[in-house]
């Protein structure tokens, strides 16, 4: 099998993983809407509830595709880890889009996984990963503080800060400005298309755009190339 044929397995694996994430996110959102706590117990309950026959078939088929890719040596340890991170990012994006929350039960393990992989020699250097996690959280914390001073209320949740910290752990500190730029432009474009001139007054979850920009950075490297 030639090297290009790995795409024929990667695409169905991605689609099947997406179906599984959508089922988990749907059940999680229903529980949050019903008044459940935003914690790991609710997430575990959603995972158990989503473990239907369809979910298990999708998960098994996706895993089979991944195993074949590993045997073909088309998917190394870092690529496999990043694929898992992209699944978590997709799940976070779906949850935030539905109930406007980014659960710590997903963002914190994602951050620690990035830091541990960096310490194991996969991904950015440990110093860059630590700097990325710290810079991601502190930068958005500072932006939010300025927004509170200016408008009198918070402009984003702590989950966005923790998500950017997790992306910094996986990507290092250098790509974070590009990730933020891509996410901000995407959010602004969607707001303008949806609300027109009233876009500046609209509230839109930032997590899906951060997750999309970060996932693209994990898969392809730089999201936006600065000319300097």
Each predicted region: which residue ranges?
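A membrane-topology feature that recognizes alpha-helical transmembrane segments
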Residues: 1-228
